[in-house]
């Protein structure tokens, strides 16, 4: 028996060529590994089969929209820097990560006459900055508008290439509408209009918003996972989704962000706020029944969330099968359905 609290228990070996650097096209041809808990059986389908296999349930998606959060600039010295915006704060301040040495007071220059000043260095390696243009402080919506012109799609660190115009389409769900994420809720990337229409005919669909932060890629550093401090992300639950969660209808959460949002609301009854819920085999889901998700990094909080549904042993067994069957992994990869 593996120790559910030991970080090493969530490790597995993944051949580099199984990390997807672009999505399967057409989307419905992406592969789908299905695990049926009642039958304790695994079978292999494609996303186009999803509506045929899904039990009766309501479906909840995350409608967050990924911003072009990566920008390139220079210090006054001329040295180049790279910034990843993470989260808006109060008083027009922003939390971000900066590649390149900076200190409090460092001024950074970007295209379109945009400037930023570093106000604080945080212990988690993030930086607090304030943006200006023509000496006027920029608010969040103004910053998002500027990012749409000078920013780059914030591809995950394991996709080792520059972003392209295709990524602006690929790395965004078709129902994305509320700006603020710096990473996509990747289970949602598999859906096209036809698939959504088909599901709408047979299932009740609703939406939450959880702005996925850069913390989703942060590794667990403690050998005992109970010592991990979970990152916090803004969420808001629509009235329809709230009513569905408050009912006793069975629920499918599309993606780990939806799961955390559903479970955080179920525990706190707060329809809006900041979610820092860490699900793992000793902190199981209390409300959500089924999970649709991608295949996640070793030792990540995301694979631990999967294990909160089906246990550590079964999770690692299924991941081994997925590798052997050459499923594609991570953000642009294939999917897994737990029913």
Curated annotation (Swiss-Prot):
GO CC annotation terms, alphabetical: cytoplasm
The keyword Ribonucleoprotein is assigned to this record: no
Record's keyword annotation contains Transferase: yes
InterPro entries cross-referenced by the UniProt entry: QueA (IPR003699), QueA_dom1 (IPR042118), QueA_dom2 (IPR042119), QueA_sf (IPR036100)
Cellular compartment(s): Cytoplasm
Pathway: tRNA modification; tRNA-queuosine biosynthesis
GO biological process per UniProt: queuosine biosynthetic process; tRNA wobble guanine modification
The entry's keywords: Cytoplasm, Queuosine biosynthesis, S-adenosyl-L-methionine, Transferase
Domain of life: Bacteria
Family: Belongs to the QueA family.
Function comment: Transfers and isomerizes the ribose moiety from AdoMet to the 7-aminomethyl group of 7-deazaguanine (preQ1-tRNA) to give epoxyqueuosine (oQ-tRNA).
Quaternary structure and partners: Monomer.
The protein's name in its UniProt record: S-adenosylmethionine:tRNA ribosyltransferase-isomerase
Organism name: Campylobacter fetus subsp. fetus (strain 82-40)
